[in-house]
Curated annotation (Swiss-Prot):
Residues bearing attached sugar chains per UniProt: 187, 190, 941, 975
Name of the coding gene: chtb-2
Region of interest (Disordered), residue spans: 310-354, 431-451, 486-512
Keywords of this entry: Glycoprotein, Signal
Pfam family, one: DUF5401
Family annotation (PANTHER family): DYNACTIN 1-RELATED MICROTUBULE-BINDING, RESTIN HOMOLOG
Signal peptide span: 1-20
Domain of life: Eukaryota
Protein name, per record: Chitin binding domain containing chtb-2
Bridged cysteine pairs (disulfide): none
Length: 980
């Protein structure tokens, strides 16, 4: 009985309106990787993975099919090729009678109500069996009420129906499908169930059609109920459902998945008896029948509905084809009329064009004559201009030759001066040799004096020994005297006068000896002081000789270096002149080539215009008129895509922003004691796609070279989980991304020398909201008017004035200045004399002994000097500027504002700096007080060539100063020796 109810539910769903046609399968799937897939044999459906991890078969919207390439449902292009969508109609009335089916029943004929509209005839019909689990059973009264609402009333009859009654039913307004039940099914009871199943298979094989659905072949697992009675029956006469030839000519079937199944024909004779094993019988609509008999009737209903639907569909397609042919005929007639009108208008337009062509030809001839005259005038002007340029070049060459001759003459004069200096040096060398000979004689005399001093020292030693012996003798006598006084104490009174006299004589003798000793010590000190003075004098003479020799060597080296530099300057000047000539020649050739290209482009445009005009005329004359069928596209208001697609999952977030702290966040720099976190070594990839997927690393960054721009790079930004996306990042200005080190750096080929006028933009800390711009060693103040500085000139030949480097060093911090050695007192005196002799500067008071640095005059600039912009003097180089920064700075050139990739010189420099970054007593400090010393340190470390070039003058001045000091020292030493 339970099985009977299940099939009753299936029948009601087939005949009633289908609430849902989504098929839920038991196939497992992965929602992440499954996506949308096609259904074999049914283009109007597609598969997707449901929320429970099972495959769903979902239909597209009406009149749409699933595109396997784009993975989306699209409108059907041609209804004749793609099968129409299913149309769900209300179920028809089912009549069951026990009468046999007559042989004259027109199965293939249409069952259409005469009064039904034409639109309902062409609508196809289909039954969709869903695999949704049926709901639990409810009370019988409610179930009947529900069925009564969803299905039409079942007309029951107990009398056999004849052919006449069936024909009368065909003429009614409501078409009804009649199912006949044979009375012979009660006669045969000896035939087994297996033989009956074999007969059913033979009948299906003869018919050549498979059943609409698979028969239930499950094995009973419950205990069968007791058999009430055995039945003998003959199945009803099932005629083969015939289909007209028109209906099988490639038309789409309703149930595509069932077309490829093996259909077994049914072969039931009219008089054949079927013997079955005892089965359970049910009473349905007043009839007692078995389960298999009920299923056979249901199968017949489905086959009949399918045949009727195919016939209606075929007629609908025929009407559509006739309508299409009629529209094509009308369209062709309209097209012929339109072509006739176009030909008439084209004839009139061609006549007008011929009339205009004559006028245009005359105007073109006059324009060509005018252009030829203008071209002749232009050629004459160009010839005069070329002659003028040639004369200027000749004059320039003559001036350059004269300049070279002047330089040659000056060089000869300098060589003569050098020769004279060498001659003077040779004479000075001879004098020096004579002086050396005199010094040797003085050394011999000093050796003799030293020997005499040694002899005198020996005599002093002997005298000292004699004095010591005398003192010992006096001490012995004193002891003896005391002993006598101890013995002769009683006789003291008698010998008092004698003792007093003797004591007086002894005191006088001791005073005389002490006086002699003091005289000897004084003479020894005087001799020692004389020896020390002579030794110091000898050392001073040796030092002066060594300094003089070094000065001669340095002078020779300076002359050699000066000659090499002069040669190099001449070579550079000659190369510069050749380059200017070459550049002028290339510029003239480039202008001529541009003029030729411009003329060629004008001719090409004219020929292209004429060719297009000819092609357009030929196209209008020869192109046949084609008919373009309009494509139906719904209006925007009618068709809007769904907000959320059912086949994809979207993770929507806000636009990515760089997290920056609040403006009030200002941590104390001196309280941070934790060590900085050392980031891991970044991973560098290659051949990455922009916005492509990447594997996100939590501990290190992943970078990749940009496929197009070297000033950009790709960073793996987090998407969700371990999945990331390659996001474009911009390096700061003047930097490029170097793949080998994974940082934004200056390339070796593009690295430029230090330029004090170059502006560098450095981002502030996250707590600050602007940028700091540096120019040289100063912060640029945008609030003050900036002055345009004249060009900075650094002459290659050392000049006599003080070098320009002092004005730059005065602005540097004291601890970063180069170590300049201090002069001794005598050397300061010589340096002051030299400075007064050369510059005429005023020396400060003698109490401080400081050298006054002369102010360097501003060098004059030649009117035609080719001085690069990077070597230009700044008038405001000594002006003070503050840290105030304009807030209207364009931040679009730095993406992101605080990149993870920092320049290499900052990463090397900042950790190694050892200075106090914050002072408790100074209050809040700006970024300039922290970064400015860093940039000064960087400037000194990065600009060795620049400083060498600026310090060249100072080095030469130092050499000249040493030479002058040596000469003054030598003259003073000569005067001292002469006096001695």
């Amino acid at each position: 009985m339970r099985t009977m109810h299940c099939f009753l539910f299936i029948l009601l769903f087939c005949l009633g309106q289908v609430f849902t046609d989504v098929i839920f399968t038991s196939e497992r799937c992965n929602r992440v990787t499954y996506g949308l897939r096609t259904v074999n044999g049914d283009p109007s459906r597609y598969k997707q993975c449901g929320p429970s991890g099972r495959v769903w078969i979902v239909p597209c919207a009406p009149q749409m099919t699933f595109d396997p390439e784009d993975r989306v449902c699209k409108e059907r292009l041609d209804s004749r090729i793609v099968k129409p969508m299913r149309k769900y109609e209300t179920s028809r009335t089912i009549i069951t009678t026990p009468a046999p089916i007559p042989s004259s029943y027109p199965v293939s004929a249409e069952v259409i109500a005469p009064g039904a509209p034409a639109a309902s005839h062409a609508a196809p019909e289909e039954f969709v069996f869903s695999t949704i689990r049926p709901k639990s059973r409810k009370p019988k009264a409610k179930t009947r009420g529900k069925f009564r609402k969803t299905t039409t009333a079942m007309i029951q009859t107990t009398t056999p129906m004849t052919v006449e009654s069936f024909e009368s039913m065909e003429m009614t307004t409501t078409p009804k499908i009649v199912i006949f039940a044979s009375k012979k099914n009660m006669n045969n009871t000896n035939r087994s169930g297996e033989s009956r199943t074999q007969l059913i298979r033979n009948r299906n094989r003869e018919r050549g059609n498979a059943p609409a659905f698979t028969r239930p072949g499950r094995v009973r697992t419950t205990t069968p109920m007791s058999v009430t009675h055995a039945t003998r029956f003959v199945p009803g006469i099932q005629h083969k459902v015939t289909v007209a030839p028109k209906e099988v000519q490639g038309m789409p079937h309703t149930l595509a998945p069932y077309e490829k199944m093996d259909r077994r024909p049914d072969s039931f004779g009219v008089e054949e008896l079927t013997t079955m094993t005892p089965e359970y019988t049910v009473r349905y609509n007043g009839q007692t029948m078995t389960e298999n008999e009920f299923l056979n009737q249901l199968l017949h209903i489905v086959q009949h509905q399918k045949t009727v639907s195919e016939r209606q569909q075929q007629e609908k397609f025929e009407k559509m084809e006739q309508e299409r042919l009629r529209q094509e005929k009308e369209e062709k007639a309209r097209e012929l009329e339109r072509r006739r009108k176009l030909e008439e208008s084209e004839t009139a337009r061609q006549a007008e064009l011929d009339r205009q062509a004559t006028i245009y030809a005359e105007q073109e001839r006059m324009a060509m004559e005018r252009n030829r005259e203008l071209e002749r005038i232009r050629l004459e002007e160009k010839k005069r201009e070329n002659e003028r340029v040639r004369q200027e070049e000749i004059a320039m060459e003559i001036s350059k030759i004269r300049e070279l001759e002047r330089l040659q003459l000056e060089r000869q004069r300098k060589n003569e001066r050098v020769r004279q200096e060498l001659e003077a040096a040779r004479k000075y060398k001879l004098q020096e040799e004579e002086r050396q000979r005199k010094i040797q004689q003085q050394k011999v005399e000093m050796e003799q004096i030293r020997q005499q001093e040694e002899a005198r020292q020996e005599q002093l030693r002997v005298l000292e020994e004699e004095r010591a012996r005398e003192l010992e003798r006096v001490r012995q006598e004193e002891l003896e005297r005391q002993h006598q006084m101890e013995i002769l104490r009683q006789q003291e009174e008698d010998q008092k006068k004698k003792k007093l006299e003797k004591d007086r004589e002894q005191r006088e003798q001791q005073e005389a000896e002490e006086l002699n000793r003091m005289i000897i010590e004084k003479e020894m000190k005087e001799n020692k002081q004389k020896m020390i003075e002579e030794k110091n004098k000898r050392k001073m003479l040796e030092k002066e000789m060594e300094d003089r020799q070094n000065a001669i060597y340095e002078e020779e080296e300076r002359r050699i270096a000066e000659e090499e530099r002069r040669k190099q300057i001449e070579i550079e000047e000659r190369r510069r002149i050749q380059q200017q000539i070459m550049i002028a020649t290339e510029e003239r050739s480039r202008l001529d080539a541009m003029e030729r290209e411009r003329e060629m482009l004008r001719q090409i445009k004219e020929s292209e215009k004429q060719r297009k005009e000819l092609e357009r005329q030929e196209l209008l004359a020869t192109t046949p008129i084609t008919t373009i069928k309009p494509i139906y596209r719904p209006d925007i208001s009618e068709y809007r895509p769904p907000d959320v697609e059912s086949h994809m999952i979207r993770f929507t977030t806000q636009s990515p922003e760089w997290a920056t702290p609040s403006p009030t966040w200002n941590p104390a720099w001196n309280t941070v004691t934790a060590e900085e976190e050392t980031p891991g070594i970044p991973i560098i990839h290659s051949q990455c796609q922009v916005n492509g997927e990447c594997e996100l690393k939590y501990d290190v960054d992943s970078f990749c070279a940009h496929p197009r721009s070297p000033s950009m790079y790709l960073q793996c930004a987090p998407l969700y989980g371990r999945l990331g996306r390659w996001t474009e990042r911009y390096c700061p200005d003047t930097l490029i991304f170097i793949v080998s080190i994974g940082r934004c750096e200056k390339g070796e080929e593009t690295r430029k020398p230090y330029d004090p006028d170059n502006r560098v933009v450095i981002p502030r800390l996250p707590s600050e909201t602007s940028f700091v711009e540096w120019k040289g060693n100063r912060v640029i103040d945008h609030q003050l008017p900036t002055h345009i500085s004249p060009p900075r000139v650094y002459p290659p030949v050392p000049e006599t004035h003080q070098p320009q480097i002092y004005s730059t060093i005065d602005q540097f911090p004291k601890d970063l200045l180069p170590k300049i050695p201090e002069l001794a007192t005598a050397e300061k005196t010589y340096a002051q004399q030299y400075q007064n002799h050369i510059h005429g500067s005023v020396v400060s008071g003698g109490h401080n002994h400081q050298v006054v640095r002369p102010i360097a005059p501003t060098p004059t600039i030649a009117p035609n000097s080719n001085v690069p912009v990077s070597y230009q003097i700044s008038q405001s180089q000594n002006s003070l500027s503050t840290n105030s920064i304009k807030s209207e700075i364009d931040l679009s050139h730095i993406h992101p504002l605080f990149p993870r990739v920092q320049p290499d010189f900052l990463s090397r420099m900042l950790p190694s700096l050892n200075f106090k970054m914050h002072d408790e007593n100074s209050g809040a400090q700006s970024l300039g007080s922290v970064v400015k010393p860093v940039l000064k340190k960087i400037a000194l470390n990065q600009t060795e060539q620049f400083l060498d070039r600026l310090l060249a003058d100072q080095k030469n001045d130092e050499k000249l100063r040493k030479e002058t000091i040596d000469r003054l020292k030598s003259s003073n030493s000569d005067n001292i020796t002469k006096k001695n």
